[in-house]
Amino acid sequence: CGICATVCPSCIIEMGPEGPHAISEMSCMSCGHCVAVCPTGALHNTRCPIDEQDPIPMETLDSKTAFNFLRMRRSIRNFKPELVPEEKIRQLLEVTRYAPTAANSQGLYFIVISDKEKVRKIADLTAQWMEEQIAANSPRKRYFVKTLQIYRDRKVDIIARNGSQLIFALCRRLNTTGISNCEQAWAYAELYAPTIGLGTTIMGFIQTCAQEN
């Protein structure tokens, strides 16, 4: 029917007398669209084998349910001292595999820190970076001064929020869309987290410090 050729984002599928064929396999981005849209399940792509696909029989969410699901996402800034089990961390990160990446480039990886002392050290290093920014008369100076007053003088962990675990989403420097890909992946994780009993937030100070160093 030619639907696969129509939806192929790389425009490498053509219809021949014996059906669809790839005119440039090297240009395939492994997105799997061709396999997904085939109405008869007849298309096989070596990069997305049909026998490895698991159809998901579910009704499309109505717009109100979908809207409310997205609205319910909240940043959690008060964390319990207990560590989240590794199994749940893996479950959380599994969903990030299905987040969109530009040109299906993927190439993301994660570092999980499950050590309260290491998290505290990272928060302290971030505070030191803020002090350096203040000394350098950064445009963010006034904001950092207030933050450090809370962190240093009042002993309130406004940087890591007393969290016991951190997850860093990373990409290679040469990946020009890597940062936005990481953000998309983490958005998936944040939306999924409450369904498995977890709370998350984006540690903005730590993120900015890491990106600038």
Functional labels for PLM-detected ranges:
Residues T6, P55-R90:
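Specificity-determining recognition surfaces
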Residues I3-P20, H33-I50:
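Iron-sulfur cluster-binding cysteine motifs and their immediate structural context
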Residues S105-Q106, A160-S164, T195-I196:
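Short gly/pro-enriched beta-turn/loop segments at secondary-structure junctions
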Residues P57, R77, L93, E117, ...:
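PEST-like low-complexity intrinsically disordered regions enriched in Ser/Thr/Pro and acidic residues
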Residues L92, T96, Q165-I167, R172-N213:
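Small-aliphatic-rich amphipathic alpha-helix that forms the alpha element of a beta-alpha
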Residues A22-V37, Q53-R71:
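Short microdomains enriched in Cys/His and/or Lys/Arg
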Residues V95-T101, L108:
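Non-catalytic interaction/regulatory modules that flank or connect domains
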Residues V112-C182:
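Glycine/small-residue-rich phosphate/adenosyl-binding loop
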